[in-house]
């Protein structure tokens, strides 16, 4: 596996923050046409407690920050040869070892992608009580899973 990684973070006036990260991964577990995957994330936050309209409540609300992030990451298949068929010689035909295909090729095998969204609030009250609220959702696309095949094919499943 080969990876290229980069990130960029920016803060302004101790109130506003933004971030971006990018990752490009390549793996020999996938076919040459689908070997490389691009994965990224963006984030932003706003410290409301630094705003002038929060000054009347600064003895109660010590710190308050709104956060949001969205991004995609990838997973690889667990096997090494999923994108091309494999053969074995565990059987005999007419008294001699005979090779037979034990796994079907899947040239379309690609990265499984997880898209995640996180929204949150960090809150500090009276400089003593810290609270964190998060809402999180994740959607998976191109799920890597074994699909059952008809037994007449001679194979049980394909990835």
Where is each model-derived feature located?
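Extracellular/periplasmic, surface-exposed regions of secreted and cell-surface proteins
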Residues: 1-159
């Amino acid at each position: 596996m080969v990876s290229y990684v980069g990130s960029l973070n920016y803060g302004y006036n101790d109130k506003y923050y933004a971030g971006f990260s990018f990752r490009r991964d390549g793996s020999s577990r996938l076919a040459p046409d689908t070997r490389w995957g691009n994965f990224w994330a963006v984030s932003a936050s706003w410290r409301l407690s630094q705003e002038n309209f929060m000054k009347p409540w600064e003895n109660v609300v010590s710190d308050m920050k709104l956060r949001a992030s969205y991004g995609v990451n990838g997973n690889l298949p667990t096997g090494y040869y999923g994108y091309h068929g494999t053969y074995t010689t565990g059987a005999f035909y007419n008294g001699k070892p005979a090779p037979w295909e034990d796994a079907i090729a899947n040239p379309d095998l690609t990265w499984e992608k997880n898209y995640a969204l996180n929204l949150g609030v960090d809150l500090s009250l009276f400089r003593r009580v810290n609270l964190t609220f998060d809402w999180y959702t994740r959607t998976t696309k191109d799920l890597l899973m074994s699909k059952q095949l008809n037994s007449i094919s001679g194979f049980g499943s394909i990835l």
